[in-house]
Amino acid sequence: MTMFLARHFTPGLLALDVLSASAAERFPLVWPTPSKGWAENRPPAEWLQHAGSGDPTTGGFGGVRTGGTRFHEGIDIKPVSRDRHGAPLDPVMAVSAGVVRHISSAPGNSGYGRYIVLEHPALTPAIYTLYAHLAKIAPDVREGVSVTTGQVLGTMGHSSGGYMIPAARAHLHFEIGLAATRDFQAWYDRRRMGGRNDHSMWNGMNLLGVDPVAFFNEWRAGRLAQPLDFFHRQETAV
């Protein structure tokens, strides 16, 4: 049984707090797991979880699977510790202060499995972050509550809906992005999708993710006073 030993996971904070002397000028940002692979510039193969092919790039962002026909709107981060049964022990942490907007605790209700969405209203714009395939959700994490940077949200796992993720490939699916509309339910109803929307506006169809690694890289380089700086640098899709 996984225990939530601390409200904040200090080592995860320290790994990023010391990245730059200018950190105080930017919004706080921490990596969502104890993995130090990104912070220490290790090869992605050491910290990205492949999707079954053995190719670590399939755990990255973008058209990295099925010959580019399937878009992966986040990154998949490997665990760094497991129990004697092989289950991940890694805590999953809020990358920045925010509000819990959605918790899907029934894995079968989404391909994300058991997942949490945070909104970060103190940032410009108010981005969302998503934490998926969780094994457990921390008992003090509930919809509507505020969370702090580095607060433990749950435990990494391999929960899913409609397909199976083997325990050996357990990971955190992590997203950063923007919600397309706050009127998603009305759009969903007009489209007559044929099924119930259990996730309000935090349904994956309404979430527009950006590359989390690129976002973190820009932050580390001191080029993001606010997330808006990142979006200003994105190429226009035509």
Locations of regions flagged by a protein language model:
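N-terminal export leaders
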Residues: 1-10
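Hydrophobic h-region of N-terminal signal peptides that target proteins for export
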Residues: 14-23
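Surface-exposed, glycine-biased beta-strand/turn segments
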Residues: 23-114, 199-238
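Conserved, short, structured surface segments that act as functional micro-motifs
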Residues: 77, 110-118, 145-223
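Zn2+-dependent peptidoglycan hydrolase active-site motif and core
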Residues: 87-89, 95-138, 165-167, 171
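Short, well-ordered loop/turn sites that connect or cap secondary structure elements
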Residues: 95, 141, 146-147
